[in-house]
Amino acid sequence: MNKIFVKTQNVKNFIGLVENLINKPQNIPKIGLVYGEPGLGKSQTALWLACKYDGIYLRASNLMTGRWLLEEIPRFLTSDNFNIVVKKLKQSPQGIFIDEIDYLMNNYKTIETLRDINDETGSPIIFIGMGLAHRKLERYKHLYDRFSEILKFETFGINDLSRIINQLSEVRFTPDATEYIFSKYNRFRQIVQLINQMENFAKDNNLTEITKEIMEQIL
């Protein structure tokens, strides 16, 4: 399988969200929310973007507290408390990507800490959550009103699926095979696993392409 980061429409929209946050005027909050069902590539995209934009990527957990947050962020900033974190980010703004934000829904103090960091520094902060994250965050009106960019990751269309297969697979999939996959699978993880399975089958059987008929026999 080719090691390529495929820029699906979701990825392009995520890039657009980050760019919009970076370029917003100072008087507009630079807080964004990306949400969607599992398996669509949100976490992989967030990590890729954090590297691309020299940002900070953190994965939340149900044990995460405001204090833990202020200990974790400084690992990237060589700072040791809130005031120094703020000072460092003012000197050299970095986007902060908080994945699995759902774990923080019942920990408003931690969410407030992130809001305060954005208020003080203007550094973009992007929350990444599951399908109902936007509904859950609506409970925190003071925070939700600060979301200037909100993006939902959608299931893949046929064009995205074709792009994923064509760029990742080392064996050709016929159009009817791609349509067959589209009718049954819409999660990135599922698609990648399927491509890997079909590549191995093609290699073991000296095949140069995968057809719908072959897939129906195997799956």
List the model feature ranges, each with a label.
Residues 33-36, 117-141:
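Sensor-1/coupling segment of RecA-like P-loop NTPase cores
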Residues 26-32:
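Pre-Walker A (Motif I) flank of P-loop NTPase domains
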Residues 58-62, 131, 136, 148-161:
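Conserved AAA+ ATPase "SRH/arginine-finger" region at the nucleotide-binding site
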Residues 1-16, 29, 39-53, 142, ...:
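C-terminal alpha-helical "lid" subdomain
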Residues 86-110, 124-129:
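Conserved P-loop NTPase "ATPase switch" module shared by AAA+ and STAND
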Residues 53-55, 121-123, 144-149:
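Short glycine-/polar-rich loops that comprise or flank the Walker A/P-loop
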Residues 2, 54-58, 65-84:
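Conserved NTP-binding/hydrolysis module of P-loop NTPases
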Residues 45, 109-116:
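A short acidic, amphipathic alpha-helical/loop segment
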